[in-house]
C-alpha cells in the first residue's frame, strides 16, 4: 500500500470546494490518497500540484515513478 501523504492531508483541511474541483477529483477520493489507501493517478498528481501551488508535488505523490512519467522534472 502507499504511504500517508501528510502535505495533502494538511492542504485538504483548509481547501475550499473550488480548490478541490480544480484537482478533477473529490474530497473523499483525495482523502483516500492522503491516507495511503489509493494511489494518485498522473493526472490527479499534476492537478494537485497546480491546485496547491506546489504544497503537494507530483514527486511526493508518485515517488516510485515520477521520473519516468515526467522526465522533464528529473532534469530540473
Regions found by a protein language model. Give the residues of each.
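Recognition helix of helix-turn-helix/homeodomain-like DNA-binding domains
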Residues: 25-40
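A short, Lys/Arg-rich alpha-helix, primarily the initiator
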Residues: 1-22, 50, 56-68, 72, ...
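Helix-turn-helix DNA-binding elements, focusing on the entry/boundary residues of the two helices
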Residues: 16-17, 42-45
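Short, solvent-exposed alpha-helical "recognition" segments
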Residues: 37-43, 69-70
